[in-house]
Curated annotation (Swiss-Prot):
InterPro entries: Ade_phspho_trans, PRibTrfase_dom, PRTase-like, UPRTase/APRTase. Pathway: Purine metabolism; AMP biosynthesis via salvage pathway; AMP from adenine: step 1/1. Its EC number is 2.4.2.7. This is Adenine phosphoribosyltransferase. The lineage of its organism: Bacteria, Bacillati, Bacillota, Bacilli, Bacillales. The gene is apt.
């Protein structure tokens, strides 16, 4: 299936000059959503995933159904203050400032093979922070899968050395 046909592009949103790639149109089409998640599941299986990690919120949209189908755990990666127990945290840079991501301190066991799933790869900052926490806990990032990759924003280069699958790619 050609997944790109199910993505709606919204010009000048959330701000002028941005062409937003809206995955909700793909999610609203049952067969397209299922086939895209199935493609990420196939990838995670080939990578030997013991657990799936996904950044909030749209990483949950692809990561949770993948973990469920594979009968393995899902690790939510959340913004600071959203997880109730002890966490590890990584501060990372945004275009205008900084943010913090966290995961529970016992979410990844040493030696576990983790596949990170998310909706979109742009600059790679969120995924880079996620990788740091996984590796800090002793996990191995076995692969990273995305619905969409925006070429030309440096994300793939920032994640050099990691196996990456993108179902849809947009040139800059």
């Amino acid at each position: 299936m050609e997944f790109k046909q199910h993505i709606k592009e919204v010009e000048n949103w959330p701000k002028e000059g941005i062409s937003f790639k809206d995955i909700t149109s793909l999610m609203q089409n049952g067969p397209a959503y299922k086939q895209s998640v199935d493609a990420l599941i196939d990838y995670a299986r080939k990578q030997g995933a013991d657990v799936i990690a996904g950044p909030e919120a749209r990483g949950f949209v692809v990561g949770c159904p993948a973990a469920y189908a594979m009968e393995i755990g899902f690790v939510p990666v959340r913004k600071e203050g959203k997880l109730p127990r002890e966490t590890v945290r990584v501060e990372y840079g945004l275009e205008y400032g900084k943010d913090v991501l966290t995961m529970h301190h016992d979410a990844i066991q040493p030696g576990q093979r983790v596949v990170i799933l998310d909706d979109l790869l742009a600059t790679g900052g969120t995924i880079e922070a996620t990788i740091k926490m996984i590796e800090q806990l002793g996990g191995t990032v076995a692969g990273i899968g995305f619905l969409i990759e925006l070429d030309g924003l440096g994300g793939r280069e920032k994640l050099e050395g990691y196996d990456i699958l993108s179902l849809i790619r947009y040139a800059d």
